[in-house]
Amino acid sequence: MNEYTFIQVDVFTDKPFGGNPLAVFPDAEGLTGEEMQSLAREMNLSETTFVLPPATAGADFKVRIFTPAAELPFAGHPVVGTHWALAHLGRVPLSGPITQVRFELGVGVLPADLHVVNGRVERVVMTQDRPTFHAILGDVTELADGIGLSPEAITETGMPVQVVSTGAPQIMGSLRSLAEVQALGAGKLNTAVLNRVCRAAGTDIA
């Protein structure tokens, strides 16, 4: 049986056990897509990434992104986390205050700038495609039920709830207050309802 190393990183935080966790397999060559999906299911995190040699000119690495349920063409949190992980492992030569690295993803080759301070990556700035705007959700009752809030928490902002994509479509909306945003959490989410809303909108809960 082959052995593959992985590391787990917390993205969007500077504190241990904070942010959004991600599993990264930095040397995934030899794994099939089915095996990657099985490993992502076993990790049971929002996403797991698998790093491969690039197949496209101009790319430094090929990265495949999986949720426990499916492969994604693109997602921000795993891309940022994988850039940091590869730099941390010494896989990216850090030259000067900014080092650019290009990932081959399901949506194409996208660059990111690694901002370096005292030899360490302090920030990852990712470039995405221009946004495209799609369907507006007219009735947000089911969406509100899925996130554990009242429909009014969404509708009283006066802002539309719309599917927007910079590579992977997502439902974008706003809430009345920061307190309502901070109150969101896994304990209040109804994933069955959210999956149904996302499928109807042509997107994914991740």
What are these regions (language model features)?
Residues 1-74, 80-206:
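Active-site proximal loop and beta-alpha junction motif in alpha/beta enzyme cores
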